[in-house]
Amino acid sequence: PGGPAPDGAAADPVFDDPVYLAKLRNFLRAAGARYNGNPDVAFIDVGTFGLWGEGHTLMTQRLKPEENERLARIHIDLHKEYFPDTQLVISDDVIGPETPGDDFPLMRYCRERGISLRDDSILVQPGEKAYFHAELARAFWPELPVVLEHEHYGNTRKSGSWNGETLLRSVEEYHASYLSIHWWPEIEWRENVETIRAVNRRLGYRIVIPELTFPAGIVPGVPFEISIRAGNAGVAPPYRDLFPAYTLTDERGGIAGVLGDETLNFRRRPADGTEIPKSRCRMTAVTPGTGFRSDRLKY
C-alpha cells in the first residue's frame, strides 16, 4: 500500500527543503544545548527522515536507494553536529527493511561516526522473516549499543507472528542492549511474563558474581586477599569501564576505605557468560587513617 498518488490524503516533507532543514536545525540546536552529554539520556534516534522516522519511504515517496542515502546523510550530519557527546542510533530500514547483507556504505558512514544501529521491525513477519539484520549488527555491538523494538504486540497476536522464543533469539543474535516494547505494558507483561524475564536476564550486560571470598577481619600491616569469580551473563558489554569496588568498615560500622580493583574491568570480559574466571586482589592495610597499599594484583 501507499506510494505517490495525485489525490493522496497524506503528504511527505521534502527532506532537503531549505526551510525544512532550517527549522530542523533550530530544533536540534536547542535540543542539543539542553540534552547533549546528559548522562540520563541513553541514546537519541536519528528520526527526522522517512516514514515514522525510520529512514525509509516505502509507503510514501518511494525514493530510489541512492536518493534515500543522500538525504539520510544530511540528517545524520545534523544530529551529529548538535549531539556530539550523546549516543545516536539509526534505523536499519535506512538501507532497506529487508535488504540482505552485512556491509553497506551508509552503515559504515554511521559506524565511523559512532552512530549505532536500531531495528524496529522484530516480528512484523513470522518465522525466518521475523528480522533481517542480525548479521549487520556484528559491525556495531562490540563497541556500540544496539537497540531493538518489536512490532505492535496486538498486531502480531492477530497475525500470528508473535513468538516469545523468536524475540529472545533476536536479542541474542543482535547482542541488543535495549529492547523497547510496542503495546500497553500491563497487557504485554501479563501475557508474556516468562519471555520478558528471559529477555531481561540476557539484555545488555549482566554482571554475575557466583563466588566472592574475603577475610572476616583485617589488621594494619598484615596483607589480606579478596578473591572474586565474576563475569558477564548478558549479550553485550557495558561500553564503559566498570570495576568492582569493596567497602571496608571498622568495628563501629564506619567506612574505613573503599577499594576499587582496576585490574578487573568488566568492559573487557566476554559477554554471554561463557567465561567466568577468578581474580585475586592482595592488599595491605597501613596504619589507621593512612589508607591501604596494594602489594600485588594477579589473575
Describe the role of every protein-language-model region.
Residues 198-252:
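Surface beta-strand/loop "capping" patches
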Residues 257-287, 294-299:
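A beta-strand/beta-hairpin structural motif
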Residues 40, 222-224, 240-242, 273-277, ...:
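Residues at beta-strand starts and edge strands
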Residues 236-241, 255-260, 289-291:
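Extended hydrophobic-aromatic, low-complexity segments
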Residues 43-185, 289-291:
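Catalytic-core regions of glycoside hydrolase
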Residues 163-214:
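Catalytic cores of secreted or luminal carbohydrate-active enzymes
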Residues 1-45, 70-82:
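An active-site-proximal structural segment forming one wall of the substrate-binding cleft
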Residues 226, 230, 290-297:
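Extracellular beta-strand-rich recognition modules
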